Amino acid sequence: MKLIIFTGLFLFAIVSLIEAEEESGRVCIPLNGECSKSPNKCCDNINCDCYLRFEKGVQTGRPCFCTEKDVIFERDE
C-alpha cells in the first residue's frame, strides 16, 4: 500500500516538474503559433505580430501570431 502511494506521489512530482519547465520560458512558440498571451516567447528569427479584428465595425479582439521576420502580409480583396 505504501509503495502505491509513494509511486503515485513520485509520478505527480514528475508531471509537475515537466509542466513547470514548459512554463518557465524554455519552450518557444513555433511559426504560426498564437502568441497573444506571451508575445516575447516566439522562437528565434520569428516575431509576434498582432492585428485588430472587427465585426460590424466593433473591435472584437486582438489576435497575435508568430510570423517570420521582415515578411509583410497584404489583405486580399
Swiss-Prot record:
<dbReference type="GO" id="GO:0005576">
    <property type="term" value="C:extracellular region"/>
</dbReference>
<dbReference type="InterPro" id="IPR019553">
    <property type="entry name" value="Spider_toxin_CSTX_knottin"/>
</dbReference>
<keyword id="KW-0964">Secreted</keyword>
<dbReference type="GO" id="GO:0090729">
    <property type="term" value="F:toxin activity"/>
</dbReference>
<protein>
    <recommendedName>
        <fullName>U10-lycotoxin-Ls1d</fullName>
    </recommendedName>
</protein>
<keyword id="KW-0800">Toxin</keyword>
<feature type="propeptide">
    <location>
        <begin position="21"/>
        <end position="26"/>
    </location>
</feature>
<dbReference type="InterPro" id="IPR004169">
    <property type="entry name" value="Spidertoxin"/>
</dbReference>
<dbReference type="GO" id="GO:0008200">
    <property type="term" value="F:ion channel inhibitor activity"/>
</dbReference>
<comment type="similarity">
    <text>Belongs to the neurotoxin 19 (CSTX) family. 09 (U10-Lctx) subfamily.</text>
</comment>
<keyword id="KW-0732">Signal</keyword>
<keyword id="KW-1015">Disulfide bond</keyword>
<feature type="signal peptide">
    <location>
        <begin position="1"/>
        <end position="20"/>
    </location>
</feature>
<dbReference type="Pfam" id="PF10530">
    <property type="entry name" value="Toxin_35"/>
</dbReference>
